[in-house]
C-alpha cells in the first residue's frame, strides 16, 4: 500500500577529483548530472496476519508493519547529463554516467528519508485507513504503526 511519494531533483557531480588544473586538463574525467527521481513509501500488507486485526463489536484495532521505501527510482526522461568533460589524454570512463546515476538514486532516497517520508507514510496510512474503516461502520478505530528508519 503506497501512502507517501516524494519527487526530488538533485545535482550530482562525479568523476575524478584532480585539484591540479593541469592534471585535470590532461587526465580529468568529470560529469554533472541533473537527476529527477521519485521515492514512494508505504506498507507491505502481505506481512499482515489474523493476529494483527482485532474486532470487538464496532471497534477495530489494526497493527500494521513498519513503513518502508517501496520504490526509489530516477525518471530517465527528465534526468540529463548537463556537462561531461574529459582530459585531452583521457578516453573517459565509459561507466561514469552509470555511476553518477547510481549515486543520484542513493542521494534521492537519502533526501526523501531526511525529509521524513516514512513518517508521512505512517500519518497518511493512519488517516486513510481510519476514514475507510469508519465508512465500513466501525465507530472506534485504533491503528498501531511501529516507527521505522531508512
Outline where the language-model segments fall.
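Domain-level marker for long, solvent-exposed, non-transmembrane regions
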Residues: 1-150
